[in-house]
Amino acid sequence: MEKICTLIIHTEIMKQVSQHKNTVQVYIIAIIAATGGLLFGFDTGVISGAIPFLQKDFGINDGIIELITTAGLVGAIAGALFCGKITDYLGRKKVILASAVIFAVGAVWSGLAPNPLNLILARLFLGIAIGVSSFAVPLYIAEISPTNIRGTLVSMFQLMVTLGVLVSYLSDLFFADETNISCWRPMFYAGVLPALILLIGMFCMPESPRWLMSKGFMQEAMLILRKIEGAETAEKVVHAINEEIEKNKNEISKWSELLKPTLRTPLFIAVGIMFFQQFVGINTVIYYSPKIFFMAGFDGAVSAIWAAVGVGVVNVTATLVSIYFIDKLGRRKLYFTGLTGIILSLVALSASFALVNELGYIGQWITVIFMFLYVAFFAISIGPLGWLIISEIFPQKVRGLGASVGSLSVWIFNSIVSFTFFKLVNALTISGSEIITDGEKAGNPAGAFGFYGLIALIALVWGYFYVPETKGISLEKIEDFWRKGGKPRKLK
């Protein structure tokens, strides 16, 4: 009897050790793949600190700066638009590897740009990799993750995006030199290093087992699933995936599939959540934070970049909090908590800018505090949730296309918000509320932040009806739920 008990205990211990090894391995895969998110964040955030020096070096106005900033986003639209089919055809891994090469070449080209037009073209090219990584990486991680920690692992993508933004701010700060207007060039060159890390790291990673099975590579998929899920669970996962493949085997993966009645709801959710993710205005802070801090009264490019670094630190910290809670509290609780905080923060920001000329030095720090809160509430909610949800809600047959549409949407909306920010600031500046700097009047962002706050309020109401609770539910069960015509808020 004693020997039997000892054997049972030993077997259980070995099982736990094996599960621990599997979990560690999955985390390593997710972290390396999520380096694509770090590059996404770096190459979108680096422009922020470069702007003051670019304007002096090339002698350009805010309109040209908006074009340079938006060029990367237009490239991202192209990347997201054309890579859905390619990802389903070639596989997730190969597409991520290709994006790493584009990231590296684009970083060098941006740093070498001799004029604004060349920089616009370089940013356009670089944007292709941003668009590709924005859907291929979360999709890859979602398909390779065990159900119980899928939310945590996919959210690592958003964590790495925020980390990339912070690294770009720190890089900007390191190279910033008020006496050297060309210091923006090495800011861009710094993006080569993480691109090489992604290229080398992903070369050693496995392909998505779900993609492999969809292409008939059953043995390879089974080997990967045994390593990341364990032998017992792998059998169940393979059975579930096979069932879905059988259901979809006579269907052709094409764009029109997304308009089928059973897929209209997940399509609407994907586009809707990405619309609200962008139109609460978060990327105006990511791209233009030094300019916004100038408006708040900060003096000098370096001091404004320091304040931007603070934004980056808050962004990363809050995303870490989100990752911890996303598979504990669930998607909906985080969504509603975050959106409520975003609304209150934007109202406070709008009020502080409306009184910026009267508040003076105190107003600067009120702006900083509520800017930090705004970023924090975004980072614990709709920031990571947008990317997570679009990677979960589509069936295997069209998951690449669905994630591509979600990613395409975010870049279109991002481009609109980024290209119109200064125009919106000027259009919504009430006469008499202009910001006075060195005796000159400039637009006041109070109205713009108020507008974004209104959008956030609409997002809160929309989320009650359309944000699904996917915590702890397998991708195959989510697919079956849509097939039965379920309503998003009833998914549990």
Segments and roles (model prediction):
Residues 227-237, 250:
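Short intracellular "coupling" helices and adjacent cytoplasmic loop segments at the cytosolic face
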Residues 234-246, 307:
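Short, well-structured alpha-helical segments
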Residues 2, 10-226, 246-492:
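Alpha-helical transmembrane bundle of multi-pass membrane proteins
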